């Protein structure tokens, strides 16, 4: 996952029912005020959520994010961010994943809910490798 590598995202654990990933605070991922940029946080959540969706795909299927909603609760000014993704719905045409983001002290800083399309092997996905990570 080249974009995830660019951001320094490290997938710590990946299973069908839970994916855990982490991203370190870095000045290059911040706004001018030293706060981690919301787009970086959303990219962390999208990465963990997409991995969760891929692990729940039927054999030969691919996926692409078709909807994502983020609620931000706190700013991150240091440390790292942990992402914990769980599938809320695994269906024939969509997979819905909820990803909670936590700061280094364990406080929830954001919650992301995303919907992933389940694409047949003949479909065109937005994820590199035909929707498989």
For each feature predicted by the language model, list its residue ranges.
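Short, small-residue-rich loop/turn micro-motifs
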Residues: 23-27, 116
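A conserved, well-ordered hydrophobic junction motif at loop->secondary-structure transitions
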Residues: 26, 30-44
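Non-catalytic linker/capping segments at the edges of enzyme domains
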Residues: 1-22, 127-133
């Amino acid at each position: 996952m080249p974009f995830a590598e660019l951001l320094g995202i490290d997938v710590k654990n990946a299973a069908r029912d839970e994916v855990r990933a982490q991203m370190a605070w870095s000045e290059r991922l911040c706004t001018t005020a030293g706060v981690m940029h919301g787009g970086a946080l959303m990219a962390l959540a999208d990465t963990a959520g997409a991995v969760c969706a891929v692990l729940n795909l039927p054999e030969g299927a691919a996926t692409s994010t078709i909807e994502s909603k983020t609620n931000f609760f706190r700013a991150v000014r240091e440390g790292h961010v942990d992402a914990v993704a769980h599938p809320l719905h695994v269906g024939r045409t969509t997979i819905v994943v909820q990803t909670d983001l936590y700061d280094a002290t364990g406080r929830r800083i954001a919650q992301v809910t995303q919907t992933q399309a389940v694409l047949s092997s003949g479909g065109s996905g937005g994820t590199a490798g035909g929707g498989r990570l």
